[in-house]
């Protein structure tokens, strides 16, 4: 299930003109690294694919905190709709729907599934 979800996430990002890279374990990775790193309309997004009954590890929670503190978006993707809604929020911000009156785009931070 998790592999199928990750494949669908990658396809969704590609279909909407974004970039993604899959993080593979190995010598240069560390515990907690997200499954997918993406860039969509200039936003850095770290995505951790999760099964419906999965829960994040302590290392994954640390990674989430680091990404958010650095100004990126972190998603625990329990389903494709979580990723789709995050991309929709980015589109709304970039297309003028997220203007907070300051002239800056509204910040998006952590978006998490159910």
Regions found by a protein language model. Name each.
Residues 1-114:
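Catalytic phosphate/metal-binding cores of nucleic-acid and nucleotide-processing enzymes, i.e., regions
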């Amino acid at each position: 299930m998790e592999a199928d979800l990750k494949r669908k996430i990658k396809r969704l990002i590609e279909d909407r003109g974004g970039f993604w890279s899959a993080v593979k374990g190995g010598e240069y990775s560390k515990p907690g690294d997200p499954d997918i790193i993406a860039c969509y309309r200039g936003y850095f997004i770290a995505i951790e694919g999760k099964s419906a009954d999965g829960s994040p590890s302590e290392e994954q929670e640390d990674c989430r905190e680091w990404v958010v503190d650095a100004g990126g978006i972190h998603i625990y993707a329990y389903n494709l709709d979580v990723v789709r809604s995050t991309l929709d929020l980015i589109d709304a911000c970039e297309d003028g729907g997220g203007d907070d009156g300051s002239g800056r785009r509204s910040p998006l931070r952590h978006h998490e599934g159910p």
